[in-house]
Amino acid sequence: MPTLLLGASIPFGTIAYTLFIFLLLLVMLRKFAWGPLMGIMKEREEHVTNEIDAAERSNAEAKKLVEEQREMLKQSRVEAQELIERAKKQAVDQKDVIVAAAKEEAESIKTSAVQEIQREKEQAIAALQEQVASLSVHIASKVIEKELKEEDQVKLIRDYIKEVGEAR
């Protein structure tokens, strides 16, 4: 009949029935609750793992892109600096060419001016020599025409100079 379990009397059939129901409940829970629940948990774990992997890949790719951008920015700065240096050198070279051309032109103008002054000086000297010769001949002819005293010669020269001054 009944067995004693902790001092209480419970019929064996009830214990067997309860044990059977408990085991049936465990099997059903495993099949219908823990199985799907564990499947969902496994799927969730895989999903989280995949998301973490994707985030790590995205992070690595972002770091790679940032590094590439930094490298490109660095390269751009180097190219810009080279461009500035070339422009400065070109400006200095162009300045040197312009200054050299200006010096050459100034020297040419100076040489031309010196030659022009020399020509005009020679022409003025030739014209003056011609006038002096003409004046000398004219005075000599006047002196020959009349024998003059010193006072008359001085007066004659002054008159002639006055005549020449008015003719100009």
Curated annotation (Swiss-Prot):
Membrane topology: Single-pass membrane protein
Cysteine pairings via disulfide bonds: none
GO molecular function: proton-transporting ATP synthase activity, rotational mechanism; proton-transporting ATPase activity, rotational mechanism
GO CC field: plasma membrane; proton-transporting ATP synthase complex
Compartment annotation: Cell membrane
Keywords: ATP synthesis, Cell membrane, CF(0), Hydrogen ion transport, Ion transport, Membrane, Transmembrane, Transmembrane helix, Transport
SUPFAM superfamilies: F1F0 ATP synthase subunit B, membrane domain (SSF81573)
The keyword Transcription is annotated on this UniProt entry: no
Gene3D superfamilies per UniProt: 6.10.250.1580
InterPro entries on file: ATP_synth_B-like_membr_sf (IPR028987), ATP_synth_b/b'su_bac/chlpt (IPR002146), ATP_synth_F0_bsu_bac (IPR005864), ATP_synthase_B_chain (IPR050059)
Main subcellular location of this protein, as a coarse class: membrane
Pfam families reported in the protein's UniProt record: ATP-synt_B
TM stretches of this protein: 9-29
HAMAP family: ATP_synth_b_bprime
Protein function: F(1)F(0) ATP synthase produces ATP from ADP in the presence of a proton or sodium gradient. F-type ATPases consist of two structural domains, F(1) containing the extramembraneous catalytic core and F(0) containing the membrane proton channel, linked together by a central stalk and a peripheral stalk. During catalysis, ATP synthesis in the catalytic domain of F(1) is coupled via a rotary mechanism of the central stalk subunits to proton translocation. Component of the F(0) channel, it forms part of the peripheral stalk, linking F(1) to F(0).
Subunit organization: F-type ATPases have 2 components, F(1) - the catalytic core - and F(0) - the membrane proton channel. F(1) has five subunits: alpha(3), beta(3), gamma(1), delta(1), epsilon(1). F(0) has three main subunits: a(1), b(2) and c(10-14). The alpha and beta chains form an alternating ring which encloses part of the gamma chain. F(1) is attached to F(0) by a central stalk formed by the gamma and epsilon chains, while a peripheral stalk is formed by the delta and b chains.
Family, similarity comment: Belongs to the ATPase B chain family.
Name of the protein in question: ATP synthase subunit b
Natural source organism: Bacillus mycoides (strain KBAB4)
